[in-house]
């Protein structure tokens, strides 16, 4: 157990909170990793801690992504900013501007995933990062995908210099290996488990 703690890092990794609100958290990852649901859960956690979060729907490719975010946000009492099928970079910028204007102190950008890491996705995510300069980039990784999770983590970290990882579906026996490998490959902390 102590070896595990040493490997994973003993310090408790928290979200970086901006001194000038809103704090912008960009959620990235492969399709099906659980970005939308777990991003909303994270926003819910921040709400419980007294923050005023806003969810921003930047995934314009998956047909039900915006609706899913609205449903999950609605269940948690968290508003969702969306502009339909617009350009994701414009949506991110408008969402952050809306948050500033309306007094939200946290913004969670739910970005598009793909089945595999591809150039178009990485370019879009890099453009969103450049446009809104997020305080935190969290990579959402499905622990059940094993080596794929490790490869994805490496690719996303190289492109975006992620700040941390949110591991989802960490409920089986062989799932801890993904956590250790992702941490080893990126050197970034596992900040949340969904």
Which role fits each region the language model picked out?
Residues 93-96, 104, 116, 123-130, ...:
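Conserved phosphate-handling catalytic cores of large alpha/beta enzymes
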Residues 1-58, 65-85, 91-111, 124:
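Primarily NTPase-proximal linker/entry elements flanking Walker-type ATP/GTP-binding cores
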Residues 13-15, 58, 113, 119-120, ...:
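Flexible, active-site-adjacent loop/turn segments at secondary-structure boundaries
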Residues 29, 57-60, 112, 140-143, ...:
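Conserved residues at beta->alpha junctions
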Residues 33, 61-63, 88-89, 113-117, ...:
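Short, small-residue-enriched loops and turns at beta-alpha junctions
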